[in-house]
């Protein structure tokens, strides 16, 4: 609501429109960072081993699990615009904001927006795209569309892969109003130069190879986070007992804590194997 009022006020001010949009993007960035920060029940972790600063414009690509993903990407840098889908573009709540900030809806194809995006890149902005096109229900990465890689080729922009983990457990696509405890992990992978032929020389080849790389890295993160320290597993276990009466529910809550979330079992039982209960 504040940002919508700000847009109404800024339209009356005798200031360059480009500067107004820059101020709006900065406020969107600060707002998203604040919303993530105040979620104290969520463990947040950001891994940026190469020290990426996002000062040089690039195409940011990320897997899409939850509405939170948008907040996470916009919190990375103020110089960022996004490619959105139909419902976000026409949203009565924030549609006007993202349209004023020069976000893009490419329902008619990326080809029509290349030159507009080129101008935005000249102003120092990066472009964020979810190559899957829509959120996943179960957290698994789906097939990548070629649009982001087509833009990278046409605009000669580097690609920065961003892996998002845990957001689908905090706010799932199927339950958008149910906010749960969990881990919000963001890992920024090394920048891939536009002229790097390691992942192929055409945007079709780069789509397949970079998608495979991101899926491999995401699988690694899933293995690392699948431990008893992840609050998601505790919540899932307790959820199985909430309809069995308050006594049994609270017994399970206390029992699991006393057993240190069954850490010993997690260490002893293999990921794959035949388990016999005798």
Where are these regions (language model features)?
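A transmembrane-helix-recognition feature enriched in membrane-embedded lipid enzymes
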Residues: 1-46, 96-97, 236, 240-253
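Short acidic-hydrophobic, aromatic-tinged amphipathic segments that line or gate anion-handling sites
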Residues: 46-47, 104-108, 194
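A general structural motif
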Residues: 55-57, 79, 124, 272-273
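Class I SAM-dependent methyltransferase core
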Residues: 276-277
């Amino acid at each position: 609501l504040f940002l919508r009022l700000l847009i109404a006020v800024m339209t009356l001010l005798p200031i360059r429109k480009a500067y107004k949009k820059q101020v709006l993007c900065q406020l969107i960035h600060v707002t998203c960072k604040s919303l993530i920060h105040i979620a104290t029940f969520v463990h947040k972790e950001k891994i940026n081993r190469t020290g990426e600063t996002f000062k040089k414009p690039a195409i940011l690509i990320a897997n899409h699990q939850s509405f939170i993903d948008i907040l996470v990407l916009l919190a990375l840098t103020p110089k960022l615009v996004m490619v959105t889908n139909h419902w976000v573009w026409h949203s009565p709540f924030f549609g006007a904001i993202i349209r004023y900030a020069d976000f893009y809806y490419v329902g008619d194809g990326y080809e029509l927006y290349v030159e507009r995006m080129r101008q935005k890149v000249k102003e120092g902005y990066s472009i964020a795209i979810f190559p899957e096109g829509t959120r996943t229900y179960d957290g698994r990465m789906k097939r990548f569309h070629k649009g982001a890689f087509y833009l990278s080729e046409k605009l000669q922009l580097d690609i920065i892969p961003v892996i998002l983990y845990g957001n689908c457990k905090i706010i799932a696509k199927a339950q958008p109003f149910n906010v749960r405890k969990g881990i919000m992990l963001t890992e920024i992978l090394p920048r891939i130069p536009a002229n790097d032929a390691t992942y192929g020389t055409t945007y079709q080849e780069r789509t397949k190879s970079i998608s495979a790389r991101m899926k491999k890295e995401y699988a690694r993160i899933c293995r690392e986070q699948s431990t008893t320290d992840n609050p998601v597993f505790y919540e899932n276990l307790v959820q199985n007992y909430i309809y069995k009466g308050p006594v049994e529910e609270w017994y399970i809550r206390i029992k699991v804590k006393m057993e240190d979330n069954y850490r010993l079992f997690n260490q002893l039982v293999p990921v794959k194997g035949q388990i016999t209960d005798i």
